[in-house]
Amino acid sequence: MTDKKYIVALDQGTTSSRAVVMDHDANIVSVSQREFEQIYPKPGWVEHDPMEIWASQSSTLVEALAKADINSDQIAAIGITNQRETVVVWERETGKPIYNAIVWQCRRTAEICEQLKRDGMEEYIRKATGLVVDPYFSGTKVKWILDHVEGSRERAKRGELLFGTVDTWLIWKMTQGRVHVTDYTNASRTMLFNIHELDWDDKMLDALDIPRAMLPEVRKSSEVYGQTNIGGKGGTRIPIAGIAGDQQAALFGQLCVKEGMAKNTYGTGCFMLMNTGEKAVTSTHGLLTTIACGPRGEVNYALEGAVFMAGASIQWLRDEMKLISDAFDSEYFATKVKDTNGVYVVPAFTGLGAPYWDPYARGAIFGLTRGVNSNHIIRATLESIAYQTRDVLEAMQADSGIRLHALRVDGGAVANNFLMQFQSDILGTRVERPEVREVTALGAAYLAGLAVGFWQNLDELQEKAVIEREFRPGIETTERNYRYSGWKKAVKRALAWEEHDEA
């Protein structure tokens, strides 16, 4: 493989498409990024134009190679990672979408979800798909398109229409309509896939009236799915060899491939995933059961918990409260006081996610006394991110029976040393921050590289996974438990605040 010097990861996110080129040592040699339009037709509705997703993603690929003066014949393989759950339906003949992509954040299918609950499907969905009944997942979005685009369900039955998550759509376009596939991680987010039988679930397809003919073939996350020509006909054919949903790609990029290993991504919200190996653990604590990647990209399972407000609560301090002018300043102000002076901030601006799942919770600040100043509130807001992470982790440990030895972290907020140290303090666990922060792209690159022999195995990659800094707990157990019990008390008082009839 000597002439093939690079792997490309395509990272198709919610607000932008990126291409990341890596060399054999997993160093990033070139990055290109393009933002694209968010479409909000009605309150709570979110769409993307699938053609714009494709145009932005394909142009970043060309640009990233051009920037570093790399020829396409030097590329060993392409890996794809993507925003999960987002739905595209298109015509098999023309490759044209019949409707905009319905994005994971879109809430338009709430009524369909209520109907599934009324039909008594909730327990079955949790057991078969590992998910909760929520508009977040793909299945109800596909039903909505088939219900609202005239004649589409009949066309789908005749095999004229195809469905895919974003990975499937990109591969269809990259292979000129020759390949219609997805991987196990993306399939596990559709609410149409049986995560135990590893096949599309007929009961779910019947419940949502979705024809099987429109569904992609489901494959492993690390294998050659097809080839793409960069530079049109006569160009070099490059294998597309890795696919994983963004959070599963980050888990793999952090090399959390053994049972009990976990990562937390601190972005707008937090996404925590714990690998549970070959057993699918059904959560009794409000977590999702999902498919992750084992050491060779094979099927492993994971528990997943989402916190809605992480980086977003720091933005609130900046934009609405005007307590800081830059998110980076939060660390400086938080360290100007020795503690929060008894203050707790519960950032339940849009309700609370795992493990509470209370859409009626609202944000609150508790424990105010005359001596409290803005620095205490800034510090308490940062601390709330760590407390919410502990909430999810406690649920994971209770569900899995696995004690976590270290938490690997990534995402924008991990640059905040105060937050990372407090996270370690409040968990009583080591927190490991990697040298390379692009772990999502790294995961897609690793999956593709392993499939084509660019890297032989994970041992080779283990050496490249350098931990830039390790944070260790610096407070006593009694102090840790005392602070956490204060948080639990604060959360309890923020729950069920909003009047239901308003909702």
UniProtKB/Swiss-Prot annotation:
UniProt key word Nucleus: no
UniProt-annotated binding residues for sn-glycerol 3-phosphate: 14, 84-85, 136, 246
Pfam families from the UniProt entry: FGGY_C, FGGY_N
Residues annotated for glycerol binding in this entry: 84-85, 136, 246-247
Subunit and interaction comment: Homotetramer and homodimer (in equilibrium). Heterodimer with EIIA-Glc. Binds 1 zinc ion per glycerol kinase EIIA-Glc dimer. The zinc ion is important for dimerization.
Sequence positions that bind ADP: 14, 18, 268, 311, 412, 416
Summary of activators and inhibitors of this protein: Activity of this regulatory enzyme is affected by several metabolites. Allosterically and non-competitively inhibited by fructose 1,6-bisphosphate (FBP) and unphosphorylated phosphocarrier protein EIIA-Glc (III-Glc), an integral component of the bacterial phosphotransferase (PTS) system.
Catalytic activity, EC: 2.7.1.30
Superkingdom of this protein's organism: Bacteria
Catalytic activity: glycerol + ATP = sn-glycerol 3-phosphate + ADP + H(+)
GO MF, any single term: glycerol kinase activity
Binding, ATP: 14-16, 268, 311, 315, 412
GO (cellular component) term, any one: cytosol
Protein name as catalogued: Glycerol kinase
Organism: Klebsiella pneumoniae (strain 342)
Pathway this chain belongs to: Polyol metabolism; glycerol degradation via glycerol kinase pathway; sn-glycerol 3-phosphate from glycerol: step 1/1
Family assignment from sequence similarity: Belongs to the FGGY kinase family.
One of the protein's GO biological processes: glycerol metabolic process
